């Protein structure tokens, strides 16, 4: 029987671009685990995406996942836009390279391992887990330890 895991994610950036971080809450039955990491130079969207990628990578086996994010960019990108990007060889409708293609490809790979149901919540609206993720992401952004090697300043 496939395990059902709840995942909550958030990304933060102090300046955009600037130092950033992600926060994750993973819940399986009654057990919760939190993850966070800060990066010296990145963007808000990259941190939102990286949170989802890392959370899904953390799962050791294929799972039924309910993933809740406050990022429409992530939710719409992975459920709607990605299909045409892949058909066009990771180009947008106007033939430009898709931004953050490295993370979209990683997210695509991870979602293929799991059955993911994507949910959106309004940020800063009192959702307990989203508020926890927001705090984790902000704290991580204030104390960055990693380099976002995929980030390219444009």
UniProtKB/Swiss-Prot annotation:
Mg(2+) 2 binds at residues 10, 134. One of its GO terms (biological process) is DNA replication, removal of RNA primer. Gene3D superfamilies: Ribonuclease H-like superfamily/Ribonuclease H (3.30.420.10). Binds 1 Mg(2+) ion per subunit. May bind a second metal ion at a regulatory site, or after substrate binding. Residues 1-142 form the RNase H type-1 domain. The keyword Hydrolase applies. Keywords: Cytoplasm, Endonuclease, Hydrolase, Magnesium, Metal-binding, Nuclease. It catalyses: Endonucleolytic cleavage to 5'-phosphomonoester. Its cofactor is Mg(2+). One of its GO terms (molecular function) is RNA-DNA hybrid ribonuclease activity. Monomer. Endonuclease that specifically degrades the RNA of RNA-DNA hybrids. This is Ribonuclease H. The gene is rnhA.
